[in-house]
Amino acid sequence: KFAREGFFVVLTTRNRVNAAALEQAIGAQGGASMIVELDLASPASISQAFATIRAQAGDPEVVIYNAGYLEGRDLPPEKELLEHIPVDMFDTAQHIASRGPFLVAKEVLPAMRKRGGGSFLISNNASSLRGRKRLTGQSLYYPRVMMRTLAQVLTEEYSEHGVHVANVVIDGLIDSPGTRALARAREHPEIVMNPEKIAEAFYYLHTQDRSCWTHELQLTPYSTKPSF
């Protein structure tokens, strides 16, 4: 969506192969993009990645923090409780859901503040709204509450400087080959969310008039009850 609207898009990923198809798709529609490798578990990698971005593309006008992890998903039913969560699994979740956005914000917000504009948008999920028991097959998502809290803090700190910060709660299954393979998605295709429409929601946030900014947006399929 952003590339279609004329933005030069920087795709960050731990391994550039992961973003190659998206880079090709952007090019096929006439857009421009580049891939920069970035490991959220490494502060040095984050600093180097943004140094590369600034050198080759300039300071970002909009940053969408969209990072996920699978930690906890493979634990068996008898290991649902917190006492069975390995510390390294928790650390990985914290790197991505808490420390990661903190370090990325430190890289991009100073330039946005000095410029008097920009957007820092966080892609989150319903587990950021309240603590919930982790069920079998679910990732260790409760650290995402910290991601939402960070968005709230940054909203208070940077709105007056013209920087739009928002937490986007994607409350459902995003369409993908893996999602389509799930039994509940096959039985109820209406619960699957269109990723292009999600992208439009992020673009809407970035282009909002500053007289009426949205700081939290929850996207839920029409056929399911919103999470609270």
Model-derived features: positions:
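A short, exposed helix-loop element centered on a Lys and neighboring polar residues
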Residues: 105-106
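Canonical Rossmann dinucleotide-binding motif of NAD(H)/NADP(H)-dependent dehydrogenases/reductases
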Residues: 1-10
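C-terminal helical subdomain
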Residues: 160-169, 181-228
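Conserved mid-core segment of classical short-chain dehydrogenase/reductases
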Residues: 47, 70-91
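Catalytic loop of short-chain dehydrogenase/reductase
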Residues: 85-89, 93, 119-146, 152, ...
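Active-site loop of short-chain dehydrogenase/reductase
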Residues: 31-32, 59-60, 112-125, 160-163
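The beta1-alpha1 cofactor-binding region of Rossmann-like NAD(H)/NADP(H)-dependent oxidoreductases
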Residues: 17, 38-49
